[in-house]
Amino acid sequence: MDYAKDVLVSTEWAAQNLQTPGVRFIEVDEDILLYETGHLPGAVKLDWQTDLWHPVERDFIEPQQVSELLGKLGIKADDTIVLYGDKSNWWASYAYWFLTYSGVSNLKIMNGGRQKWVAEGREMTTEAPTVTATTYPALQRDESLRAYRDEVRAHLESVNNGQGAMVDVRSPDEFSGKVTHMPNYPQEGVLRGGHIPGARNIPWAKATNEDGTFKSADELKALYEGEGVTADKDVIAYCRIAERSSHSWFVLRELLGYPKVRNYDGSWTEWGNGVGLPIEKTYSEE
């Protein structure tokens, strides 16, 4: 079977379209300094820490600010935006989800991301592109793509009766409650470990190949259906701060075409600190 939507481009396609009018490349990395060490010619940088988040509240910038951001990057409304980055496109997927949620269309991801481009020895530059600012039109959020804490809590009933599914895309040790964060990552202040009751643990990396590309549609379908996460269910995905769950959201909604998939961006850093929220913990030190 083919992917449900035409949302991926190959590194070869990207190399052939670096100078194509109406095609714009945006790099989004976990390591926000990586872009300066070399990037695709013509690509602009999106900093997930400063560009997408509200400077004070734990929330995103408003749609008007998204329009201003894209305008500052020289993006036009009818441009095809190709996102790519490090970590098998973690943060490129996060930006894809956020921009889709904000009402932006014509989005694609470069399959394999930065690591595949570099591994193939393709052209890189440290030169920042010259950008002519544009006026990007007004945007409207699609709230059907985002899950909030109270919605997640209400969703537990749907999970229990088999109409909904909850996907925890973190590592097995995070899921069990043995640890509250990934190895070699800072502790982000989560007071409790474990997972949301009823969640299925399907680590994000199971959807990728060693070169950072996504697995085939047939493999992805078997992966999720094998855990009872089927297209007829209302699905919510979460991780720690929503970058890994954005990757899984992209797989489920864009590559497999599941109609109802939401990303819980509060994820474990909200749920694990929430007073009175139910938690399952399967790890025991005994």
UniProtKB/Swiss-Prot annotation:
GO terms for cellular component: cytoplasm. Residues 19-126, 160-280 form the Rhodanese domain. It catalyses: thiosulfate + hydrogen cyanide = thiocyanate + sulfite + 2 H(+). It comes from Deinococcus radiodurans (strain ATCC 13939 / DSM 20539 / JCM 16871 / CCUG 27074 / LMG 4051 / NBRC 15346 / NCIMB 9279 / VKM B-1422 / R1). InterPro entries: Rhodanese-like_dom, Rhodanese-like_dom_sf, Thiosulfate_sulfurtransferase, Thiosulphate_STrfase_CS. GO terms for molecular function: thiosulfate-cyanide sulfurtransferase activity. It holds the Pfam family Rhodanese. The keyword Cytoplasm applies. Contains two rhodanese domains with different primary structures but with near identical secondary structure conformations suggesting a common evolutionary origin. Only the C-terminal rhodanese domain contains the catalytic cysteine residue. Its EC number is 2.8.1.1. The keyword Lipid metabolism does not apply. The active site is at C239. It is an enzyme of class 2 (transferase). The lineage of its organism: Bacteria, Thermotogati, Deinococcota, Deinococci, Deinococcales. Substrate binds at R244. It is found in: Cytoplasm. This is Thiosulfate sulfurtransferase. Its main location: cytoplasm. Keywords: Cytoplasm, Repeat, Transferase.
